[in-house]
Regions:
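C-terminal cap of metal-dependent C-N hydrolases
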Residues: 72, 83-118
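His/Asp/Glu-enriched, well-ordered alpha-helical/loop segment
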Residues: 1-3, 8-87, 91-93
Length: 118
């Protein structure tokens, strides 16, 4: 799995200037004012969620499509794609619904989801 999501993937519904063009983001779709698609807003966590829901593939094999497999194809599997001694320790913590809770790069936490308790 891959994503070519543009900057709009992280934006709320509204109008934005992206790449020198006006882009309208609505319901997780980015379009130009004339209605043409402006680009992808599919994030990798959503792609993984869709992939498992629509194929019935098991979690371990699904995770490999966004970790080990691309690292091997890009010839960076000596340091990326899995957690092992001597590797970079880049990983994401997520729940059963693929909601991201934390992201680590080279073993350092760079993102943590803030949970608001009601």
């Amino acid at each position: 799995l891959v994503t070519d999501a543009m900057k709009a993937c992280l934006l709320e519904d509204g109008e934005y200037e992206l790449g020198g063009q006006r882009v309208v983001v609505k319901n997780e779709v980015a379009r130009l004012p004339a209605g043409n698609l402006a680009g992808s807003v599919l994030t990798l966590d959503k792609a993984l969620r869709n992939f498992t829901a629509n194929t019935g593939i098991g979690l371990i094999d699904a995770i490999k499509t966004v970790t080990e497999n691309p690292a091997r194809v890009l010839k960076v599997n000596d340091r990326k794609g899995s957690i092992d001694i001597g590797k970079d320790a880049d990983f994401v913590l997520f729940d059963d619904s693929f909601n991201i809770h934390a992201t680590f790069v080279k073993g350092k936490k760079v993102y943590e989801r803030v949970v608001k308790w009601e």
